[in-house]
Regions:
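N-terminal signal peptide c-region/cleavage motif recognized by signal peptidases
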Residues: 22-24
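Extended, polar beta-sheet/loop recognition surfaces of beta-rich domains
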Residues: 48-52, 110-125
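Short strand-edge motifs at loop-to-beta-strand transitions and within beta-strands
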Residues: 87-91
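Bacterial N-terminal signal peptides that target proteins for export
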Residues: 2-11
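Short, surface-exposed alpha-helix to beta-strand junction/turn motifs within ectodomains of secreted
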Residues: 50, 55-77
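N-terminal edge beta-strand
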Residues: 26-45
């Protein structure tokens, strides 16, 4: 009988932990929001593009680049993880003409998970 109780306790502990496991497996840095917002239309060049993630990023392995409407890389755009908020990726943006632009990002969270994606915005005059 004394051997059965510890087994039951272990079984109960496992059953209680099961609902938590999917959340642990899904602990990647996801894009929480951006400025400018995805699919937005702007009247002029934004001073910078900001991408906020759900987890802190590894600065050495996280970055982004800007593409124009022809999917060519825009010179002068440079991305870096913010020195104060490690979940924020900031991109300086050169003067841009009217058109559609795509921010392509690839970030590594501090727990080493890779997340990649893109978002677009449009500039009108």
């Amino acid at each position: 009988m004394s051997c059965i109780r510890p087994r039951r306790l272990v079984l109960v502990a496992i059953l209680l932990a099961l609902p938590v496991l999917p959340g642990l497996a899904d602990a990647h840095a996801k894009l929480a929001r951006s400025d400018p917002p995805a699919s937005s239309t702007l009247r002029g060049t934004p001073p910078e593009v900001k991408l906020w993630f759900t987890e802190s990023l590894e600065p050495s392995f996280s970055g982004a680049h800007l593409l124009d409407g022809e999917r060519r890389r825009v010179d002068g755009a440079a991305a870096r993880v913010d020195a104060v908020d490690a979940a924020l990726l900031r991109m300086t943006v050169p003067a841009l003409g009217p058109g559609r632009y795509t921010v392509v990002y690839r970030v590594v969270s501090v727990d080493s998970h890779v997340t990649a994606g893109e978002l677009t915005f449009r500039i009108v005059r």
